[in-house]
């Protein structure tokens, strides 16, 4: 179960507690395969093969590149968890929720690669529901923000089954692809500007692709 980094400062009167759930990286893709090679050239791969492991957030940031890096940076900037609780929880393919600081080893990465992230997959579903139910009481006064895919069932169905209308997502995610979302979150961190959130239940989760992010210091560019 995730614990994550703990913030001890309480929010102001108008600011709610907020925790983030980050969707996992694709552990069966080419970048994940690079880390699993017998003689990995990347320092991160050597950590995994060395037995000591590497931080989950670091591994997923390498595997997913811009998208997960954006999610993790954004969550670190804006998490405001209840006292004694972690503010960032990573959804994993078969270990439920884990903090980004937890150690991932080579056999974990290989195991993740073999488990589909699908609402009907019991190896994914059961651990996630277990951890959501265990943490739900601690989140009674908190907003729970999903940073991940909102268009499919794989996260939406399970999160809302336990947490109901407490689950939110950034409304600016609608219509954007992974790379665009990653860039949007990194831009938000740089500008110290939190995105607006809406409840996941009943929301419009599909839409037209929005305009591209404007260049820094320039005018918005429309999608062509």
Where do the protein language model's features map onto the residues?
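Peripheral peptide segments
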Residues: 2-224
């Amino acid at each position: 179960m995730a614990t994550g980094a703990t913030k001890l400062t309480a929010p102001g009167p108008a600011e709610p507690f907020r925790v983030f759930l980050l969707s996992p990286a694709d552990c069966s893709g080419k970048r994940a395969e690079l880390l699993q090679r017998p003689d990995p050239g990347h320092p991160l791969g050597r950590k995994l093969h060395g037995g000591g492991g590497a931080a989950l957030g670091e591994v997923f940031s390498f595997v997913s590149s811009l998208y997960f890096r954006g999610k993790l940076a954004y969550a670190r900037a804006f998490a405001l968890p209840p006292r004694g609780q972690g503010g960032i929880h990573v959804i994993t393919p078969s270990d439920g929720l884990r903090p980004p600081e937890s150690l991932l080893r080579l056999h974990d990465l290989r195991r993740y690669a073999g488990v589909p992230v699908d609402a009907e997959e019991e190896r994914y579903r059961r651990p996630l529901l277990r951890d959501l139910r265990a943490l739900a009481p601690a989140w009674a006064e908190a907003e729970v923000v999903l940073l991940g895919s909102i268009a499919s069932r794989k996260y939406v169905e399970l999160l809302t089954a336990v947490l109901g209308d407490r689950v939110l997502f950034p409304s600016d995610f609608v219509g954007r692809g992974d790379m665009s979302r990653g860039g949007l979150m990194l831009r938000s961190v740089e500008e110290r500007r939190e995105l607006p959130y809406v409840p996941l239940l009943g929301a419009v989760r599909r839409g037209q692709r929005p305009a591209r992010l404007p260049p820094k210091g320039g005018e918005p560019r429309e999608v062509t």
